[in-house]
């Protein structure tokens, strides 16, 4: 620490002295990213320099180090040192952070501390030049003579470069300004602006900004192009190929030229301020744009103005140049005005006017083919030309008139052409008086068509004929042309005629007002249908007239007129028309009250409007009881109408009843002179109070839970305005309980007993009201309302069990007591209570059921118990008979007991009391019902010794004791279920149930197998329950069912015997019962045949057996004789040892010459296995899970014995002589071990010991021990 402090003090007192440096560090400049080396060395000295180091640009000392990379600075700083007098600093990949002053410091032995400074300048060359507001190489649009300010930016450079401006390669120094902005990293951003005042000559020139850095000699540039906008020149217009004068029909071409403009201008022709369809062309050399438009000159182009417009975005308002055309054309036509008809001796003024022309037209006149001097002519200038006009007067008495007319012709002419037109003036004269034909018969029926002709002779022009009818003038239109004054007159007449029709309809009941209008309005109405024609010098008008009632007693008039008459010539005839009324009306006589009330006298009026002659009126009611009876009524009115017809009214009086409501009354108007009668109908609307269509009261009986809807059908007129419902006298609105009232409909949904009652409906209308009553009775099944609680009694006590029930209807003896399904005699108190009197005995103890049935729904049931004190009794439960568990596992033993009162359980093993809840045992007691109890013993950590002992369940109470011994066995197969029964069947389902047995020591499932009769397809279904419902079965089919149990260890019981169940047929009958009746006889036939065959075979077997036994007896006697002779008269003894399990079905002991079996043959506890060494050893198969014993090598032998062979025999492989071969071989392969999930019975094993031959296994037959000795 002290040496470091001294070193710092020495270096702190360093003074600058370059005379002692052999190589002093120099200033350096370099581009960022390159490497530099500061060199520093001192002069040689006898004593080496003790210390040397560098100080960085940040003022920090880099430290005393040997040659190599210095710590920090990203490994870019390093010392270079060849000897003690030098220390060079190398920096790689320099950056702006390295810019600054560096100092070399040394400690000289003679001079002391010395130092030398140098500077490192980092150069950043320009990388980018850009315009601040424009993209590089872009085009800048600027208006002519408008200043443009452009700024050029050079970012992040060091040192600042020189920025130059160029326009098309020429340096621009005027209006240039430059500024810079320093940054924290010691770089600069340089800004240079240029102001340009451009004109159209600068268009398209390139402006360049260049940045030049002298230190690096780097130049970078960016460019932009000027787009100078300026307007075009004024347009010039001309007519190409200009003729001396334009004429209508000439092809005219006009051109408009414009020079310059940026952007190029749009040049178009306009006429009447509408742009014309034309196109422009551009001359690239002269920059001239020309638009040419061609068209055919017409008279409309005379003095027309065509305008050329040039415009671009710089122009603002377009520049315009217009030209007017002068076109010569003839008059298209002339127009003549003046009178067409004059009387002889009068004069007419005619005016002739030409249509526009250029130049003006000259008018000339020709009358009846001769030219006349032209009067003074006038001229008018119009839009496209000049109109000429002239007047002339024509006197009929001064001219020669032919065919009653004068021909006047006018002609207009100019240098381009002429036009003429004629005018005819007629000389008029009056015709003769007209004549009417076709109305000789003056009586007609309405609707008839009458052809009438009017003729007028002579006249010029010929007469115009018109038809009129009535006191008013009804015009029948002709076909000749009418003047405007006549047209207006006709229109007014038509409008007034329409008014007449409206008034007639509106005032048909107000005669005085109608006649007022009749006599104050005089109307002429046109009627279509007249046909006019001319034949020779006469006019004819034919009218096809459809006669109607308005023509009755009216005059039909024909008028002849022409221009020569001031008043028309008239001829007329009168018409008489028969017609019925258009309609007949029925109305109540009292217009103030339109209602008809029941029992009140009523009057109806039937009226006919305008008939000729007067109508005869009769009445009819459309009721079945009237039989179309005709009523005449009373005539109350018979008057004349404006059409000279008759109005008739008839009154019918009657008293209406309810049956009249809706009845239609017919009024019939007829007359012998009419072609048909006219009638009308009137429905009677008879008002009466509401009336029920059902008998009162209405009784509705429903079952609880049902729904009903009762429509009471109330009739009344007018409609019922108020419905009021009450239940048991209490009003309610729409809903009460589950009953709903809507108008006359009373309905209920899922009724309850509380909905029963008397419902009253009051229906009211404006005439009166009525009531009706509905008695709603809700039937419900009987319900147990009270039942005695379970009773515990001693033997001999008298016990009363009471049961009360309610139901609708309540019936006598609807309550009964049952026990085990049998009815018991009881005392009844009324309909709702039954009392059962019992003498308490053990036989009477148990569950008692009270059933209440009133015939509605499902009978109600209630249970109670009579519990008679009794000693415990263990109930036989098949699945509790034994228990099983694996070594080290858990077994569960259960017993179920009946006892009254409460029972106490005790478990024992080997007469030793089992303690509760120890590590070996745990006990759980459960009460199932009032008299049934169950105790469960859990046995844990099973050992082989547990298999040799039983556990005992002891149940006791104050009245006695009972017990059950339960063996513990290894896991085995489950026992097959029993009592497989069908609980229900439908058309396509069968429900079955069964009872399980012992489960083999693990959880069991049940596998149900079924198949349809005459079908080989077998179905298997697994379930953990003791019942099953199968669906999707065929209707009316028989099925075979079997069931077995499979436990969790894979052991399975055998299948139960097949049981037949069946689905129902369409009638709901079980087909299995029907088929069993039919198959009873056919089922027994195969059994009878089998019995006969077996009986015959048995006789044959007995005969063979007797013969064979006789033969063997003789052979045995012969053998014994031989042995006696060889052995000195003694028979060799044979001793028997071992164990056999009896199987009556598989073996049978011989009757003769067999020694008696020892007691070991009856033991079922021990089996003897013969080892390969000949030793016998006991086997405990229950300790293992294997399903069989170890089998040694053996040879199959068959020994002759009884008729039955021995099953599954095993021989030990020992080196002893084999017994002799039998005289015959059995077909049984008795040595094949069968596997049936450990369900086959235990194999037989017998062991016999011969002193000379060793141990032999199998049944003995003395005849085979040594072979045949004879």
From Swiss-Prot:
Its main location: membrane. Changing residue 105 to A: Loss of syg-1 interaction. Expressed in vulval epithelial cells. It is found in: Cell membrane; Synapse. The keyword Signal applies. Residues 1106-1270 are cytoplasmic. InterPro entries: BTN3A2-like_Ig-C, CD80_C2-set, Cell_adhesion_signaling, FN3_dom, FN3_sf, Ig-like_dom, Ig-like_dom_sf, Ig-like_fold. Disruption phenotype: Animals are viable, fertile, egg-laying proficient and coordinated. Abnormal synaptic vesicle clustering in the HSNL motor neuron from larval stage L3 through to adulthood. Reduced accumulation of synaptic vesicle proteins snb-1 and cat-1 in HSNL motor neuron. Defective synapse specificity due to altered distribution of synapses. syg-1 is mis-localized and diffusely distributed on the axon of the HSNL neuron. Residues 976-1066 form the Fibronectin type-III domain. Residues 1231-1250 are annotated as: Disordered. Cell adhesion protein. Determines synapse formation. Required for correct localization of syg-1 at synaptic sites. This is Synaptogenesis protein syg-2. It comes from Caenorhabditis elegans.
